[in-house]
A protein has these predicted regions:
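Acidic, Ser/Thr/Pro-rich low-complexity intrinsically disordered segments
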Residues: 266-342
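Solvent-exposed loop segments of extracellular immunoglobulin-like
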Residues: 61-69, 180-190
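C-terminal edge beta-strand
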Residues: 85, 110-117, 238-249, 393-395
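A short beta-strand segment in extracellular, disulfide-stabilized domains
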Residues: 45-60, 156-179
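Conserved structural position at the C-terminal beta-strand
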Residues: 101, 232, 380-382
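Solvent-exposed segments in extracellular or luminal domains encompassing
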Residues: 83-94, 207-225
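C-terminal edge strands of extracellular/lumenal beta-sandwich accessory domains
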Residues: 236, 252, 307-327, 366-400
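Secretory targeting signatures
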Residues: 1-40, 44-47, 52-58, 68, ...
């Protein structure tokens, strides 16, 4: 009898143990936050009677059984269920669409406003005016195309300011945009000054309203490459967009300054700084940077250590380029003194030596021959004992 009671007790104990997970059961309940997200197509210029496809597949959390309820007309009643749905609106106007997503224990909703326009309305055409500077900083013609290319010429900078940098303002013009029909008009001009960055956080990086107006001034623009967008809306509520590349190239020069001589066993250097952009994800990539140094072959104040020798008076200045980690990328030291006629060096009394930094140098790869973008420095280096009056240094940042 005792053995039977013991067996019965063990059986009951095992049954209770097996049912332990069935009671009090919060452990398996989903604790992740519900995030309701939906898109719709077409996203713009939706016409009365047109079928609109709604999709909530981006709602979170992924991998969890969710339910979806749609209210398409703002009357707080459910018009459709399911992760996808379609709807149409017979009348022109604005409609609020609500999506409610639930995991059975909690829910979250989101709303969007749709503008429905007349089925016969004509869309506008957005058109950003392209243009280029007439000349670059050398007086050469600048190519034109379906882009904006502006040269900034910061010539004859002070020798106490050895940074190649400047900010300018440029004009953006949409006067060639059209409303769609002769009896319509353009009611809104919205400019997005960086179509890769979602400034308003609505999930669309190309629809930010940074500036408004048919013609606007874009201020505080530094050398670089930019992609901007324009969205216009006509009186019927239809929209159209255009985008364009903007290139700001730059040149700075320093004229008639002194370069000290190496009288202590260490070369004398002058540093000139410039900022380089090479960001492929943002589409801001420099094409090349160039340093151009012109100096007299022989300094007028030079005295030979050995009278009549002349070797001591033959100048040789070099350009050395360093990235922001102070790693040297390249230099001109291997260019012989009788080979220094780069560019338009038309004087027999001067040396002209150029240092070109291609875009490849500014990439950020695993290769030992690339150095990244950011703050760079060009150093003028004098290894020789005599000082020298330099005629000019030019730094060009070419983005187109």
């Amino acid at each position: 009898m005792g053995a039977m009671r013991k067996a019965t007790f063990l059986a009951v104990l095992m049954m209770i143990s097996g049912l332990a997970g069935c009671f009090g059961g919060d452990e398996d309940e989903n604790t992740e936050e519900i995030v309701a997200v939906f898109t719709y197509s077409p996203a713009t210029n939706i016409r009365s009677g047109q079928t609109i496809d709604f999709d909530a597949r981006d709602s979170l959390p992924a991998g969890v059984a969710l339910t979806y309820k749609w209210d398409f007309d703002g009357d707080n009643s459910i018009d459709a269920t399911g992760r996808t749905a379609d709807w149409s609106y017979p009348e022109v106007g604005e409609y609020t669409v609500e999506l409610i997503v639930s995991d059975g224990s909690k829910s979250q909703s989101t709303t969007k406003t749709l503008t429905i326009v007349d089925a016969t309305a004509l869309p506008p055409t957005a058109d950003i005016t392209s243009y280029s500077s007439d000349e670059d900083c050398e007086g050469e013609d600048v190519d034109t195309g379906s882009y904006i290319h502006v040269w900034v010429c910061d010539m004859d900078k002070s020798n106490t300011d050895r940074t190649a940098d400047s900010e300018i303002s440029i004009e953006l013009d949409a006067e060639d945009s059209t409303s769609g029909s002769s009896d319509d008009y353009i009611s809104k001009y919205h400019w997005d000054l960086d179509i890769e960055f979602d400034a308003d956080g609505d999930g669309d990086p190309a629809n930010d309203n940074d500036l408004e107006g048919e013609t606007v001034e874009w201020k505080d623009l530094s050398p670089g490459e930019y992609e901007i967008g324009l969205t216009i809306t006509n009186g019927k509520g239809l929209t159209d967009s255009d985008d364009i590349k903007v290139y700001i190239s730059y040149a700075a020069s320093w004229l008639d300054f002194e370069m000290g001589g190496n009288t202590s066993g260490s070369p004398v250097e002058l540093d000139f700084e410039f900022l380089v952009h090479y960001d492929q994800d943002r589409g801001n990539t420099i094409r090349k940077a160039v340093g151009e140094l012109t100096y007299p072959k022989i300094d007028g104040d030079c005295t030979d250590i050995t009278p009549g020798d002349g070797n001591n008076c033959r100048a040789k200045l070099d350009l050395h380029a360093f990235n922001e980690e102070d790693e040297e990328a390249t230099n001109t030291s291997n260019t012989a003194v009788d080979q220094r006629k780069d560019g338009d060096c038309n004087s027999d009394d001067n040396d002209c030596v150029h240092l070109t930094l291609s875009s490849y140098l500014f990439t950020d790869s695993e290769s030992e021959s690339t150095y990244g973008d950011g703050e760079w420095t060009i150093k003028i280096r004098n290894n020789r004992v005599n000082d020298l009056q330099v005629e000019s240094l030019v730094i060009r940042l070419v983005y187109k």
